[in-house]
Amino acid sequence: NPYWLYSRNKAACEELLLAEHARTGFPVTIVRPSHTYCERSLPVQIHGAGGAWAVLERMMQGKRVPVACDGESLWVMTTAEDFAVYFCGLLGNHAAIGEAFHITSDETITWNQVYRALADILGVDYRPCYVPAWLLAQSRLYDFNGSILGDKANSVIFDNSKVRRVTGIGRIDFTPYAVGARRSVEYFLSHPDMQRPDPDFQAFCDHVEDVAAGMML
């Protein structure tokens, strides 16, 4: 992702560590998860500083939620406990030294499917506001240049055969997003401390909806 300093720094760290391994034998194993989450962290495509609650709040209020492009880019989300299965298989594994591994769910879904799953869990209609990624990247409030234009607006598909081979752990039954998301949503709804108001994001969503509507005229 050339748009995001966070991603460029991670790539630079990998290069540094692998070079040190080649030079001195420094024991390094690189692990690349994909959008790992738990009950306290719900993956959505676009959110503000307060996290996913503001998105759930909009959906429950019958408001539209911003979605980059047409919502059909592919994404992969992995629960922390599923990630841990293969991660533990790499710990102390000499065959993993000097290697890099993906550890991700085998389920690849679109962002439309993500939001429809959330709508079904909440018992509401899915009301997207499709916004071009380049337009979101113009935001002065959020760094959507890196996280959307260079990241979540693009499709990703991962091959986990390497980590299965090296750990000796076969395919596991990864938690489907609809199941993991339900667990997260129920946690959010039952824990008031997770329900953080985010008026800046709400105002941003309303503004983006107005701008997007004007572009369609």
Predicted regions and their residues:
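Glycine/proline-rich active-site loop of Rossmann-fold NAD(P)-dependent oxidoreductases
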Residues: 24, 36-54, 90-101, 124-125
